């Protein structure tokens, strides 16, 4: 019997790229309206589950703060934090997930950096 070797990085990348194609909930970008609300200070992000992160976890004012969104491509958290004033870098293993962030940034005039790498 031959051992099957699975490359976890390649497997993860392919899975998340497919999720984007399928419209998975973690791959659906935020709306332009969500971005506009974030610009006005009315924002929230969800990291796991369905409940927004407690705002006390983050500074009251994100203006100029450096934020690393690790393994969080998909056009959700990074764009919202960028709209709230943070300098955002989104690091993810999926080119398509990062593409969602890039699409929102271009659509809504946001500055954020995306970095592709294994996670």
Task: Kindly label every feature range from the protein language model.
Residues 65-119:
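Class I SAM-dependent methyltransferase SAM/SAH-binding core
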Residues 1-2, 6-8, 33, 42-43, ...:
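Mixed-charge, polar/low-complexity N-terminal
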Residues 28-65:
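Conserved alpha-helix/loop element of class I SAM-dependent methyltransferases that forms part
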Residues 1-37:
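N-terminal, positively charged/glycine-rich alpha-helical extensions of SAM-dependent methyltransferases
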Residues 14, 21, 53, 66, ...:
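Conserved N-terminal segment of class I S-adenosyl-L-methionine
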């Amino acid at each position: 019997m031959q051992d099957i070797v699975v490359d976890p990085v390649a497997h993860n990348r392919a899975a998340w790229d497919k999720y984007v194609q399928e419209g998975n909930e973690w791959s659906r970008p935020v709306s332009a309206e969500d971005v506009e609300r974030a610009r006005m200070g009315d924002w929230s992000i969800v990291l796991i589950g369905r409940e927004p992160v407690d705002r006390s976890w983050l500074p009251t004012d994100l203006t100029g703060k450096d934020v690393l969104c690790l393994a969080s491509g998909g056009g959700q958290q990074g764009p919202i934090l960028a709209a709230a004033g943070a300098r955002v870098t989104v690091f993810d293993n999926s080119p398509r997930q990062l593409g969602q962030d890039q699409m929102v940034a271009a659509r809504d005039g946001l500055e954020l950096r995306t970095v592709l790498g294994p996670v």
